[in-house]
């Protein structure tokens, strides 16, 4: 491999561009009369996996979202663990910071949405739609700024978005899931216990953790909870400490990085960004549902994150990540308003069985709020990091 190609593959900004191009191409295909049906048919292509009594039969889209994205979340779990143990989030006060930020970033958007829709018995079910952050697209936009982004700021966004996603998974399980499989949840809990024992006994063979992780992934998938959660959990248990110059967590993260940046995230963007705008009108943007979502994402996210972080620092409950200021946190908070795929998923659950118009209006609000947040967040950070 020549030097230019090596540099290109290691360039985070280039990976961000590929993600945006994949998303734009998906939007084109989904809104073009001659390609719309072929695009949808490809994503709904059934893919079956059988191994003994195990039978998993899902559409291609769900394999990308549940299986490939579990590897992305595995890498995120590894990166967050490293920062918690030896990086910018080390120490109780700094570790608490993204947790508190995520809570504020979920509370404020939900309240803003509720303020616009509390009188509509159907629309109020969508209160959780603007609470989500699409970690893949948020990191993709941040990656466009390349090496200018301080590592501490990137890790803060990563940790905040992971906690945000975990919060969204809990909300979905509590408010939007009718049935959870207790047997599968028990198997998942047992798998986590095995991972903890392996880590406690000092087992350093990565393949052992990944094997248990596959059992955990299947159990979480079958339980009715979002399967990507398994990736984060496995990443947090893989040993980090070096022994004879060998760190399983760091080496696995480095190995996953090019696959995630150049294959998994672009595929995710291509499969999920194809939102059909058929039946959408700009007049509808100013109705209560899309307005509540747009303002919840663009205003509520950064406002909630910034205010609660300011309060936590003042009360000495948490501490800012090293080499960052509150204005940096506010700018990253704007990027957290990119709800996109996770928000669309919650909208489909919230308005399941309701009038299709609510789903269309929700998508309009999600798209407008996410695009505005991406553009403004990128601009703010670019100006600040100049």
Swiss-Prot record:
GO cellular component, one term: plasma membrane
Alphabetical UniProt keywords: Antiport, Cell inner membrane, Cell membrane, Ion transport, Membrane, Sodium, Sodium transport, Transmembrane, Transmembrane helix, Transport
Assigned protein family: Belongs to the NhaA Na(+)/H(+) (TC 2.A.33) antiporter family.
A GO biological process held by the record: regulation of pH
Gene3D superfamilies: Na+/H+ antiporter like domain (1.20.1530.10)
Main function: Na(+)/H(+) antiporter that extrudes sodium in exchange for external protons.
Protein name: Na(+)/H(+) antiporter NhaA
Any one Gene Ontology molecular-function term assigned to this protein's record: sodium:proton antiporter activity
Compartments it resides in: Cell inner membrane
InterPro entries: Na/H_antiporter_dom_sf, NhaA
Disulfide bonds: none
Topology with respect to the bilayer: Multi-pass membrane protein
Reactions catalysed according to its record: Na(+)(in) + 2 H(+)(out) = Na(+)(out) + 2 H(+)(in)
Transmembrane segments: 11-31, 60-80, 96-116, 126-146, 155-175, 180-200, 218-238, 260-280, 293-313, 326-346, 358-378
Database matches in PANTHER family: NA(+)_H(+) ANTIPORTER NHAA, SODIUM ION/PROTON ANTIPORTER NHAA-RELATED
């Amino acid at each position: 491999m020549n030097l230019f190609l090596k540099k290109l593959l290691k360039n985070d900004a280039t990976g961000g561009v590929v993600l945006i191009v994949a998303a734009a191409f998906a939007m084109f295909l989904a809104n073009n009369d001659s390609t719309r049906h072929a695009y949808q048919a490809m994503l709904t292509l059934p893919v079956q996996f059988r191994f003994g009594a195990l039978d998993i039969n899902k559409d291609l889209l769900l394999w990308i979202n549940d299986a490939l994205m579990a590897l992305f979340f595995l890498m995120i779990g590894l990166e967050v663990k490293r920062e918690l143990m030896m990086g910018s989030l080390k120490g109780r006060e700094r570790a608490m910071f993204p947790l508190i930020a995520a809570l504020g970033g979920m509370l404020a958007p939900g309240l803003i949405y509720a303020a616009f829709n509390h009188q509509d018995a159907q629309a109020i079910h969508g209160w959780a739609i603007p609470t989500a952050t699409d970690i893949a697209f948020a990191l993709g936009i941040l990656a466009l700024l390349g090496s200018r982004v301080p590592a501490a700021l990137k890790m803060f966004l990563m940790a905040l978005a992971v906690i945000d996603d975990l919060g969204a998974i809990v909300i979905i399980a509590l408010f939007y899931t009718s049935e959870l499989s207790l047997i599968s949840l028990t198997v998942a809990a047992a798998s986590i216990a095995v991972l903890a024992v392996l880590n406690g006994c000092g087992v350093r063979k990565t393949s052992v953790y990944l094997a248990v992780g596959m059992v955990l992934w299947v159990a979480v998938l079958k339980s009715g909870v979002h399967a990507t959660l398994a990736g984060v959990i496995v990443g947090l248990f893989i040993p980090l400490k070096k022994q004879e110059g060998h760190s399983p967590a760091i080496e696995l993260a480095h190995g996953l990085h090019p696959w995630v940046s150049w294959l998994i995230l672009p595929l995710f963007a291509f499969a999920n960004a194809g939102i059909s705008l058929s039946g959408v009108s700009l007049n509808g943007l100013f109705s209560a549902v899309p307005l509540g979502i747009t303002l919840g994402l663009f205003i509520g996210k950064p406002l909630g994150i910034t205010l609660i972080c300011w309060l936590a620092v003042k009360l000495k409950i948490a501490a800012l990540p090293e080499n960052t200021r509150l204005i940096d946190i506010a700018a990253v908070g704007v990027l957290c308003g990119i709800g996109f795929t996770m928000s669309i998923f919650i909208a489909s659950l919230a308005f399941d069985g309701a009038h299709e118009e609510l789903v269309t209006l929700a998508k309009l609000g999600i798209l407008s709020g996410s695009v505005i947040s991406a553009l403004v967040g990128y601009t703010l950070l670019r100006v600040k990091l100049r």
